[in-house]
Design a protein with these regions (language model features):
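Charged catalytic cores and adjacent phosphate/nucleic-acid-binding surfaces used
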Residues: 103-200
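Extended substrate/RNA-proximal surfaces in nucleic-acid metabolism proteins
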Residues: 1-121
Length: 200
């Protein structure tokens, strides 16, 4: 806050809602005091036995592209559902494909699918998280942040996905500069599920 104290809000990451939206909604109904909900997808569909991206074995480039398409289908369903604050780490498959398996994958060629996701989010009043990815390539990176802005998106949070203390706050300022370079002039926090806009 303005007096130098850290404000602690209440939030959750709600993963895999696309497996059972009714269950996800029932869960949220039991937590009315939340300030912030990240909607996220970490698994592929039943075609891949709901396997978590983290555990997916090495594969060919064409198999990886099929996995990205499968993932984006679930992300689009989640975006259309829209009962959350921001969509977390849109380009998450790249973390595991590139950083864990040494591939050179991108979401290039999926512009239509990503645009559909962004339009659904904007229509539902949801935003996106720019995940600093513990200092690696942000999820999503500048190309997709620019597209989000061009489509009318304004709600963006910066998430460090820290998991351990040494990553808390990592690259937060640099990521805000990235947002600004993509035409996004505000970073958001949330209070009582409503975005609060802070000028960068």
């Amino acid at each position: 806050g303005a007096d130098g104290r850290i404000i602690v809000r209440r939030g959750i990451e709600l993963g895999e809602a696309a497996r059972d939206f009714a269950y996800a909604e029932a869960l949220l109904d039991r937590l009315p005091e939340l300030d912030f909900v990240i909607g996220s997808q970490h698994q592929l569909s039943a075609r891949y036995e709901w396997n978590d991206l983290y555990f997916m074995p090495e594969c060919t480039e064409s198999e990886a592209r099929e996995q990205i398409a499968d993932y984006l289908t679930l992300v689009l369903k989640t975006a259309r559902w829209g009962k959350f604050s921001v969509l977390g780490h849109l380009t998450l498959p790249l973390r595991y494909m590139n950083e864990n398996h040494g591939m050179h994958m991108s979401f290039d060629g999926f512009e239509d699918e990503v645009s559909q996701v962004f339009r659904a989010l904007i229509e539902n009043g949801c935003g996106i998280e720019c995940n600093v990815n513990r200092g690696n390539t942000p999820l999503p990176d500048g190309k997709w942040l620019k597209l989000y802005h061009e489509l009318g998106g304004e709600i963006v949070t910066v998430g460090t996905d820290a998991h351990t203390p040494e990553f808390v706050g990592m690259r937060a300022r640099e990521t805000q500069e990235l947002l600004k370079s993509c035409g996004l002039n505000y970073v958001c926090t949330f209070e009582k599920r409503k975005p609060v806009f802070h000028k960068i």
